[in-house]
């Protein structure tokens, strides 16, 4: 037992020099394991006389406890050092600029919708809505479409299956049924804007089976074509943000208006680039006219007492013209790159005072 102190010193030095937890565990096994050095000395106590066994046992227990305490302390130090190294590797530099946040963008159709509503709201119009699945009366008959009109054909309109009573519904081909429902449901004066989705059997670079349209309707006792011209002058100049935008009305025909007109705005096509404003070219943007007496009668209004005007245009079309979007189909492709390029800030709401399309 004379070498207990030497063993103690050797083991304490080895514990202090252990560079990692694996080395420390190897020292624990060699000292305190079943075949460890201290364990081996403890097994020799049985061959000693009682007095010597008592003294040697006390000495070995002290060394055993001291080595165990040293192992625990060194293990705690190594664990703390490992944690410190890990934290140093994962340290964040709070002075660095943060990564840019991924933000959404307002779709050009939604932006154009809000711009149009903002302009007409300043003129006293209110937004009216109606169902997208309509019946023949509201979509055609009440709007003075004759029975053989091409719009009633299967190749131009999406019809739903025929019902048991022989009637069949359809996807509305315009938002004009909203006008019909409004005139039948309330008394004049009426001043509404009817934006929404419409459906027609058509698909190419400038047509899609579903598109957005907005229509306006004014009904009162003294409404005339001059009011229509003034209203549309205000709109096109505010929307395209061109104060002196040239504008002309060409005679046309629509079943639901009489007289009817198509509206052109001035533009320039020099160098192959379209520029809205002064120029030697004209660009058609909408249709309009005075509400046909037959339409007023179908809605229960006396055409001798009330007159009105209506107008309509495609949201995609005027968005393409204002924002230089070449292909109508890209509006519906859900391409995030396209939306980042043509989209608008979510909180930048259009107003006439603050600006429509900042």
UniProtKB/Swiss-Prot annotation:
Gene Ontology terms, MF aspect: ATP binding; magnesium ion binding; phenylalanine-tRNA ligase activity; tRNA binding
Cellular component, GO annotation: cytoplasm
Catalytic activity, as annotated: tRNA(Phe) + L-phenylalanine + ATP = L-phenylalanyl-tRNA(Phe) + AMP + diphosphate + H(+)
Keywords of this entry: Aminoacyl-tRNA synthetase, ATP-binding, Cytoplasm, Ligase, Magnesium, Metal-binding, Nucleotide-binding, Protein biosynthesis
An example Gene Ontology biological process: phenylalanyl-tRNA aminoacylation
Keyword Transport: no
Subcellular location(s) per record: Cytoplasm
Ligand binding (Mg(2+)): 258
CDD domains according to UniProt: PheRS_alpha_core
Cofactor note: Binds 2 magnesium ions per tetramer.
Pfam assignment, any one: tRNA-synt_2d
Xref: InterPro entries: aa-tRNA-synth_II, aa-tRNA-synth_II/BPL/LPL, Phe-tRNA-synth_IIc_asu, Phe-tRNA_ligase_II_N, Phe_tRNA_ligase_alpha1_bac, Phenylalanyl-tRNA_Synthase, tRNA-bd_arm
PROSITE patterns: AA_TRNA_LIGASE_II
EC assignment: 6.1.1.20
Cofactor(s) needed: Mg(2+)
Oligomer status and interactors: Tetramer of two alpha and two beta subunits.
NCBIfam families linked: pheS (TIGR00468)
Family: Belongs to the class-II aminoacyl-tRNA synthetase family. Phe-tRNA synthetase alpha subunit type 1 subfamily.
Name used for this protein in its record: Phenylalanine--tRNA ligase alpha subunit
């Amino acid at each position: 037992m004379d070498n207990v102190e030497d063993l103690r010193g050797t083991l304490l030095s080895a514990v202090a020099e252990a560079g990692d937890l694996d080395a420390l565990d190897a020292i624990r096994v060699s000292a305190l394991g079943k075949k460890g050095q201290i364990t081996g000395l403890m097994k020799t106590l049985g061959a000693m006389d009682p007095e010597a066994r008592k003294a040697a046992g006390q000495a070995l227990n002290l060394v055993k406890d001291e080595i165990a305490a040293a192992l625990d302390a060194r293990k705690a130090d190594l664990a703390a050092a490992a944690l410190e190294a890990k934290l140093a590797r994962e340290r964040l530099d709070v002075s660095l600029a943060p990564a840019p946040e991924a933000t959404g963008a307002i779709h050009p159709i939604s932006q154009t919708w809000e711009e149009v509503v903002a302009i007409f709201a300043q003129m006293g119009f209110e937004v009216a809505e109606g169902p997208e699945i309509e019946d023949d009366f509201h979509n055609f008959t009440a709007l003075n479409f004759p029975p053989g009109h091409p719009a009633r054909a299967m190749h131009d309109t999406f019809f739903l299956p025929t019902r048991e009573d022989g009637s069949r519904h359809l996807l509305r081909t315009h938002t004009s049924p909203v006008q019909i429902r409004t005139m039948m449901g309330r008394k004049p004066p009426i001043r509404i804007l009817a934006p929404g989705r419409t459906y027609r059997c058509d698909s190419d670079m400038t047509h899609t089976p579903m598109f957005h349209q907005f229509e306006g309707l004014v009904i009162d006792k003294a409404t005339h074509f001059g009011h229509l011209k003034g209203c549309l002058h205000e709109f096109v100049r505010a929307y395209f943000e061109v104060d002196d935008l040239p504008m002309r009305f060409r005679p046309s025909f629509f079943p639901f208006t009489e007289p009817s007109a198509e509206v052109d705005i001035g533009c320039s096509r020099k160098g192959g680039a379209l520029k809205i404003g002064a120029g030697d070219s004209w660009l058609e943007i909408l249709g309009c006219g005075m509400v046909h007496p037959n339409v007023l009668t179908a809605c229960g209004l006396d055409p001798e007492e009330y007159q009105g005007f209506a107008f309509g245009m495609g949201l995609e079309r005027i968005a393409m013209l204002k924002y230089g979007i070449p292909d109508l189909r890209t509006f519906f492709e859900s391409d995030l790159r396209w939306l980042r390029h043509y989209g608008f800030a979510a909180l930048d709401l259009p107003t006439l005072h603050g600006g429509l399309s900042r």
